[in-house]
Amino acid sequence: MAKTLDNIRNFCIIAHVDHGKTTLSDRILELTHAVSARELKAQTLDAMDLERERGITIKSHPVSMEYTAKDGKTYLFNLLDTPGHVDFAYEVSRSMGACEGALLVVDAAQGVEAQTVANTYFAQDAKLEIVPVLNKVDLPGANVAEVSREIEDILAIPMDDPLHVSAKTGVGCPDVLEAIVNRIPPPVTEGVDAPLRALVFDSVFDEFRGVITYVRIVDGSIKAGQTVTFMASGVSTTIHETGIFSPTKKPVDRLEAGQVGYLVGTVKDPSEIKIGDTVTTTRLGATEPLPGFHDIHPTVFCGIYPMSTDEFPKVEQGLEKLHLNDSAFTFHHESSLALGFGFRCGFLGLLHMEIVQERLRREFNLDIISTSPGVVYKLKLRDGTIKDLDNPLQMPDPTMFETISEPILKARIITPSESIGDVMRIVMDRRGMVEGTETMDAKRVMLHTMLPLNEILIDFHDTLKSVSHGSASMDYEPAGYQESDIVKMDILLNGETVDAFATMVHRTKARTRGIQMCKALADTIPPHQFKIPVQAAIGKEIIAREDIRPFRKDVLAKLYGGDVTRKMKVLEKQKRGKARMKEFGHVNVPQSAFIAVLKGTIKES
């Protein structure tokens, strides 16, 4: 059935974690009969168990549905259920590029949170029509008037015609459907006969059909049998199938301007399909791509090693399979004297890293060790060239470069007013700077801060939640690079460097971090027959030390009384043996010691 553009509405739903975005999606699917009552389950669009458990959306899930409005016309709704976390910011911005409007869901009890602010800015940058929806109005703690004021004052969105809903019970949800029809504009296009331009907003890998590309048709149309080109990557493919999401994939004869759907071609390598790329016909195609495309690069790196060397092929296989549906993360082989063979992996951010590691453990039943996360530093070499550094082991001698710069974040932290002092203190402790404050309401304040990315990697979120009694929320965006006094810190056991423990730290934090790591290792490495010094060093300078005291074998047990000189002789022999053992002995480091240091059990003091 042909759809005029006036009858199409493309929209997304944006919200802070736990404000009810996915529940509202479920209600919309139910009310438009896109999913039958028998098939409907909580969080229908969140396909991964991990998404359901954490209550977050990790992967975009588009869905098309038909709705007969009160005006008697039938409309085609295309809902793009996007991730909300900052790690997936580029994916969110491209998904928004496929929409004309957004439902902004705000919890009527919690109010505007950090992620609400960040995602609203994305929507405003994409020039979307924003429809505010106050959710959970049935809760006893709901304060509709106060939250409406916050939305007007902080987000500059007029609340002339607010929508009050309870996505859980369905109250007010039919009004949301009418608002989508009346307040979100239809797609604007050059027409069905114009050269094809389609925006790629996601892709998935199917082991039988290869890469399935999710697109929004901006201009023109496409059908099976046509040859298309991806303008940024230059890849060409013949289309075998076009289809829509309802909510599962359903083949259709053609996709036309304004529609959202999928393309199945002959591409087998997911890395060839880039989010934000423009698809056009190879023959008589568009000359100008859609604006906004750029390559995404990992910002957080860590090493992933199997607990047992026998599982190395399984870890490689697991990473390869995950990479097929998530080409944003990168990996390549690396080896460590301490941990053996493993992989150096790059991620879009901390949440992205946690998700990949958790999926390896859960979906492939693997035991892995992950080294401390690190960021990408920029070295200015003596000849003026800039070199990226994502692995402490590749850090050159300080005489080889002039300066080192680290990534900085612009962070918004929303916290209860009574916790503002503690929150400012932890920002300062992490080498951050508070640039300004903004009063949200009588009880909450928003801090505008600048923070080094390296400082929030280990336990910043935990500390933030702790000092604010679980009430603070935070969102951030990259703010470029800044010169800094970053040094490489090594850990030595019995005088030998252990490469797996090498880490990059700011010089002012090196001693504290060194003491923590030495203490953690001294507490977890069992005693040997000789004393083991555990040292932290920057270059040749030792900055921290702990000793593991030896256990003593009772060499006098076999002597029965007798001359004291005989006992002294045996003890002297033991002492010489221990000295020799200290010189040539090998320190056995148990897995628990690596895990204690590498899995972040060392917290900032």
Task: Enumerate the language-model features and the residues they cover.
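Structural and coupling elements of P-loop NTPases
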Residues: 1-605
